[in-house]
Each structure stands twice: as structure tokens, then as C-alpha cells.
Amino acid sequence: MTKGIKKILYLAVTGLIMAAPLNAAVNNELICIDPGHQIRGNSGLEEVAPGSSVKKLKVSSGTRGVATKKYEYQLTLEVGLKLRDALQNKGYKVFMVRETNDVDISNKERAIKTNNAGCTLYIRLHADGINNSSTQGTSVLTSSPKNPYTKSVQKSSDKFSHDILSEYVKATGAKNRGVSYRDDLTGTNWSKVTNTLIEFGFMSNPEEDRKMSTPEYQTKMVNGMVNGIEKYLREK
């Protein structure tokens, strides 16, 4: 064997060894995606948090686009499946809370499913609606430092929320409506996993509603979320 061939083989093997930890790190991350809502709401009640006497509706069907007439549960699944594909193409393992619209999974059950799956990150996909057609923009929701139910993941969830928001805004150009600290969200309170809830935009705004249903904009939405996930994982 010539010295040249030996050198090429050495460099190739060294490169593989050096690359292995990076690929292993990616492959060890399980990302959980929860496309919000479902085709039929469930008006039954469930505890808003473990041991809480406060109860809320299990799950609703969400809002509806004023221009597209598309339901929120349709939009979130549409984008969620594209996010799944994008992450899998990068080597991540993905757990989908739902892959069809005709399901009956409460917000508490969604969180428990992701806890049991052993997820690294849990992202909940939603879209906003309000009685003001001019309001637009994106926001993320997470728990506050004073929330007694989320102490183990509050700080990491706060950072994850900021990372998702900043990268989503950068990719889409959407108006940044900031981080909203909420302690009344069932899915957040039951989660033992670093998590965030993103509101893509307002389906009550005709322009934003139409935009969120275009393939081009959905690609930007997905790219932003992937970038946010990878930013968090790099820096955690």
C-alpha cells in the first residue's frame, strides 16, 4: 500500500470518528410535535395541573381562518407533518402526538404522552384568533418562574421558547409579539419535558391567514422552528 493511499484512508477514518459524536448527538434527540386541537372538541373537564382542584375543558377544535376557512386543527397538522419531515431529514427522531385530525386526545393526555415517550423537546403548534382583523404576528407561551408545577423545566422551557420565537421571526418576517408567561395552560402544567407553545400567526387576519396556508410561507415557518430547535440544542 502506498503512503498516499494510507494517508487517504487515515483521513477518512479520522473524519468518521470525529463525525460520529455529532451524528450520535442528533440521533439521541427525540423531538415531540403536538399539532394543536382536533376535528371535534371534548367539553369534558380535566385538572389544569397535577393535584389541582381547578379544571378546564379537555380540548377544543380551535379557531378558523377568516379568508381560507381552514380550521386551526387542519393548519397545525399540515405544518406539523412538514416539521416532522424536516427534522427526520436532519437525522432527528420525532414523536407525533397526532397524525390525523380525527382523534380525541385531551391537553393533559398530550403532555403525558410526550412525558412517557421520553422526549427531549416538546413543541405545541397553534394559531391565534381574535375579534380584530388587523391584529397579526407570532408569539410563544410558556410558564412563569412562580409556577409550582413546572419548576424542573421552567428555565429550559423559557430559553427554548425564546429560541423558537427569535428564529421563527427571522425566517418568516412575522411580527414578534413576544413571550407570554401563562400558568393556566394544562399542557404546560402537566409536561415534564422542556416545552413551548407557538402561535404561528392570526387566522383572524385575512392576509396572515392566507399566507400561513401557502407552501412557500409554510417552508419558512418550518425552517424557523427547525433553526430554533437546533439553536436550543447547541446551547443547552
Named regions from a protein language model:
Residues M1-K236:
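Catalytic-site microenvironment of enzymes
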